[in-house]
Amino acid sequence: VAQNGAGDLGIYLQITRGVVEKRQHAFPEHPLPTVFAYAFDISPPSDGSPETASCFRAVTRRDQRWGRCHIKSTALLGNVLHIMEAVEEEAEEVLLFNEQNELTEAAACNVFVVRGDKILTPELDHQKLPGVTRRQCLELLEAHTDWSVEVRPVSRDEVLSASEIWLSSS
């Protein structure tokens, strides 16, 4: 961080199992992990007021990603294809829905839906990555607010009629 000028920086860290001399799908016995990291500028945190909140345009799509989204991996082709569809429609994010028309997540974020005095967020399962920031938001909402938080399936109709939608991501 100091070498990159300190200040408001994000750090991307990726550690893989490593490489093998000959391509194979089985895990190697004694791999040497590959470690990759870099720092990048981020905006300072907002004060949380409506005047400084960031607004984004999002589109909705049927979730076409693979069925193991709860696994953190670099296999992001499905997410990338969804984002590219959003960009083609001049949107910054895409809200994804499963075959039952229930919200899964966004292509790069977890989702919170505000309806009346309730905050809804989908329950975790194989279709959703359990985000660190999502968990922290839930803990803070429970400890420091009077908001009613419901972790449960969230329908497309509930999303489309929401008064607010929050996205959380590290």
Q: Which residue stretches match the model-derived regions?
A:
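Short, glycine/charge-rich beta-strand/loop segments that flank catalytic centers
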Residues: 1, 8-23
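Helix-start/capping segments and mature chain N-termini
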Residues: 3, 21-170
